[in-house]
């Protein structure tokens, strides 16, 4: 296990999932602790299908978002776990409420997931300061860029990254996300344009 991880579980039975598919309760543990990329990716696919396939967010995305943030910020992830956990948060941050979820009464799931991320931005920014993997850091730039309503805080964060000569993925993501925020007028919201 990575860094003394205790079990990370989500009660999939208590939330709506895509097509009613309920992953094994221990899938989050595997996602976080496995050193094998194929095992982590398989866990990612099971989680994605249940909660955020094709960026269509199910009710399950709400507790999942909180769990993913905890994984990132607690240092509980293996290298591949962190890589795919931030990718999952990236997909959720860009998501929209699944049409069938809205019909079932789950309106605003996407904005509620982004709100969970927004509430944890100080922790995510602090964690980003210790991440050296370019792909993972680029994902955090995107996640914070589409959720942080505080333009000064986000610009300070990205400028600090630029001042330390980030990798090409991070530098490109800062440029692209800054341009997107300018076009969008700030962070993401349900129904905003992703162009």
Give each language-model segment a name.
Residues 1-38:
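N-terminal "cap/leader" segments of large eukaryotic alpha-helical scaffolds
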